[in-house]
Structures are given as structure tokens and as C-alpha cells.
From Swiss-Prot:
Belongs to the purine/pyrimidine phosphoribosyltransferase family. GO terms for cellular component: cytoplasm. Its EC number is 2.4.2.7. Its main location: cytoplasm. It is found in: Cytoplasm. This is Adenine phosphoribosyltransferase. The gene is apt. GO terms for molecular function: adenine binding; adenine phosphoribosyltransferase activity; AMP binding. InterPro entries: Ade_phspho_trans, PRibTrfase_dom, PRTase-like, UPRTase/APRTase.
Length: 177
């Protein structure tokens, strides 16, 4: 059974008209979770993208990022919501569909020129991923690639991220449904 068929679709969540792609059904399945990690690991071992650390976006990016960091032998750096990191942080505010939000990283999380793989579960508008990339760059890091389990191409995040020059990899997509 492929990855896409293991992802539950929840209609009208979190609001009417939204088709929510729920990866919890994928990652609770040991075969499904292994497929995700093995496919991403193989992709990054074989495609020549060079990076030193994995940056995971709260919260589902922690699940994916932690497992990938382990299998690839890399360190893991969390991107968190405000007030969740105990030491000095760098913060970035970004636009949402209705308002703004903020994310943070420790100021000592990366060193100048350090190359990272940025990971999250799902790419929709691209706002959070671009904000996380902004934090990486604010700290002097370089985003070597971005990886997602799911891409929702109709929402436009992939196009927006590619236009900014970032490399993207995803395992499956839900187009027009």
C-alpha cells in the first residue's frame, strides 16, 4: 500500500471547505512510517544534496526530522512557536491567510555557512517553510533543500518556494481533491 493511501482525509477541518490531510494514520502504521523515512533517507543519500543538519518545523516536522537526522547521521535543530525555547532566540513573524504568526530558533543553533535540510509534514501555502528558511538565513545558514511528506500544489506553496530558488522534495501530493 503506497504512502498516499495511508493518509486520512478529514473534510471540513479545521473549517468548512478544507480537506485536511492527516498524516497520523500514516505514521501510526509502522510500515507506513518506515516507507516515509526510508524513501527520504534514500533520496538524500543518492541525490548529492550536501547538508550538515536537519531543521524540523514544530510539531509534525519534529517527527520526520528526528527520524531522518538519526538515519542520516545528522544533528537536529527545532523551529518552535514563541516561548518554547529556553535560551536566546531569533524570531521571525510571517503572514498567514488571516493574520500573522511567529516562529523561533536558538541563536546558537547554526553556524555561519552551515547547510541544512528543512523538513515538515505538509506543504500548503509555503508560509511556514519560507519563514523557517528566513530564520536559517538570519543565523547565517543555507537551506540546501526542503522535504515534505505531502504537497498540496493547488494551494501554491510549491510554486512560491521554487520561485525563491529553493530545492524541494516531497513523497506524494493531493492535487485537485
Amino acid at each position: 500500500m503506497p504512502i498516499k493511501s495511508r493518509i486520512r482525509t478529514v473534510p471540513d477541518y479545521p473549517k468548512k471547505g478544507i480537506m485536511f490531510r492527516d498524516i497520523t494514520t500514516l505514521i501510526k502504521d509502522p510500515v507506513g512510517f518506515r516507507l516515509v523515512i526510508d524513501n527520504m533517507t534514500q533520496h538524500y543519500l543518492s541525490n548529492g544534496v550536501d547538508f550538515d543538519a536537519i531543521v524540523g518545523i514544530e510539531s509534525r516536522g519534529f517527527i520526520l526530522g528526528g527520524a531522518l537526522a538519526y538515519t542520516l547521521g545528522k544533528g537536529f535543530v527545532p523551529v518552535r512557536k514563541p516561548g518554547k525555547l529556553p535560551a536566546d532566540v531569533v524570531q521571525l513573524e510571517y503572514e498567514l491567510e488571516y493574520g500573522t504568526d511567529k516562529i523561533e530558533m536558538h541563536t546558537d543553533a547554526l553556524v555561519q555557512g552551515q547547510r541544512v535540510l528543512l523538513v515538515d509534514d505538509l506543504l500548503a501555502t509555503g508560509g511556514t517553510a519560507l519563514a523557517a528558511a528566513g530564520l536559517v538565513e538570519k543565523l547565517g545558514g543555507v537551506v540546501a533543500s526542503m522535504a515534505f511528506i505531502v504537497n498540496l500544489p493547488d494551494i501554491g506553496g510549491e510554486k512560491k518556494i521554487r520561485e525563491k530558488g529553493y530545492n524541494i522534495y516531497f513523497l506524494t501530493e493531493f492535487e485537485g481533491d
